[in-house]
Amino acid sequence: MYLNKHDYDLIVAGGGLAGLIVASSAAYYSNQTLRILVIDRNPLPILGRKTITGWICGDAVGKKSVDYMTERIGLKWGYPEIEHPVKGVIAYSPNHEAAISFDGEGYLLNRKMLPQKQLQDALKLGVEIRGNIALRSVLAENDTVVGVAGQDLITNEAFKKTSRLVIDATGVTSVLRTNLPIKSFIQTKIDRLDLEATGRYIYNFDKASEDKTYFDSRYCIIHLDQKIAPGGYAWVFPKGENKVNIGLGVQQKALDRHNANRGIRQDVKALIDNYVRSNPVISNPTIACEEMDDGNGWGTWQVSVRRQNDCLVANGFMMVGDSGWMPKPLDAGGIGPAIIAATIAGKDAVEAIEATDTTEKGLWKYNINYINEYGYKTAGLEVFRRMLQTLTNEDIDYGMKHFLSKMDIDSITNGQHPEFSSLDMMSMIIRGSFNRHLAESLRYTANMNKKLVEHYHDYPSDPQDFEKWHKVLLDYLAQAYSRFQ
């Protein structure tokens, strides 16, 4: 019915950050010879908006990720989509006595302005973009995705378009992935424990004092504190000298336990409001409502904090960004992984289309290319995150002071095998102040991280070997989950 005639070579579902990059990447690598359509539910002037409250995001991204895109497909960002540069990220212990810096230079983006820059970039590359279309499902034939179906929100008419390949960039709650009607290795549903509820304000404010552990215009600040953000962390990301993206993310299970222990019923907004009030630097906060922030000053969202989907392709189908559960498990940072994945996916999609092989096997190299570039480290970060969620504030204070050096954090975030300051461990044993349980948890996590990284570097080159590989992965993760319940 559909296979012999296609409206487009490539349809990208979702016109957010990842969707517009993958479309531009495909246009670049095909020398603009492919018919590419991007579809978004929003009107083009508010392209990529996540909910009616705006483009909810922490807004931070590492310079290396942006450079990765620019060096490969030539897309360049500047002001106003890049709103403020930072020198790195600093994580503080609950008592603020220990700090670890990591990640290097980066940017705070303006997520309302960025889609308009991306829109113009994509149009210049010959990409067609349709707004006001709500996609409900993929079209499938002979166990292959061959297009998309939905509704035109202006005319209320049915919308249906066919293509050689569909790339899903519709976000963590993707109905295309959840209701995928064909046989595949893609995991269609996410475990609730692998989701965090997040929220943030974008505030203009007056400075009441100077305290670099609460606000520093040069650095993104993370506060690890189970009382402030149960099972997650809180952040203060500068967007200028007197402007901030401030918020937090929590694990729902940890928040429920937090509330039960205190006999209260706090939601994410209440936690954030308390967090803002407790900040001694921020005075007279007002929601940013200038043109570049209007309609984007407050919002909540759900973010995945697990490894990327164990398989990112099926016959006629690929996933990028949040729909593939790509945010970093340790801090829910999703922009960097999305940029990298979308840049790679565009190239791999073009090669598959030009080879007239958009089967699962023809697209399989995208799994491998993404893992080799970024995804190899995410399962280890997922285990590290689960370990952190079992710690008390006292454990975190102690661990950050005695165990976790900058080298250890860099090793963890790069998927390497940290040593966890073994000399400090020896000196603490001599002093009799050794926290053996915490040390054993860190060592176990480091060893499991090493196994997982090695296993990901052995990702199968052929789909027929996936199930065997996947069983070993799930066995490793089950062991870790049982330890950190």
Predicted regions and their residues:
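Active-site-proximal substrate-binding core of FAD-dependent oxidoreductases
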Residues: W325, K347-Y398
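FAD/FMN-dependent oxidoreductases across multiple families
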Residues: L135, I228-A234, V250-D256, A260-A345, ...
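N-terminal Rossmann-like FAD-binding beta1-loop-alpha1 element of flavoenzymes
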Residues: L3-V38
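Predominantly flavin-linked oxidoreductase catalytic cores and closely associated redox partners
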Residues: G15, S25-Y28, D121-S283, W325
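C-terminal auxiliary extensions adjacent to catalytic cores
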Residues: M387-Q485
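Short beta-strand to alpha-helix junction loop
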Residues: C57-K64, S101-D121, Y201, D256-D267
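A conserved beta-strand/loop capping segment in the N-terminal third of enzymes
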Residues: D67-K117
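N-terminal FAD cofactor-binding segment of flavoenzymes
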Residues: S25, Y29, R41-V89
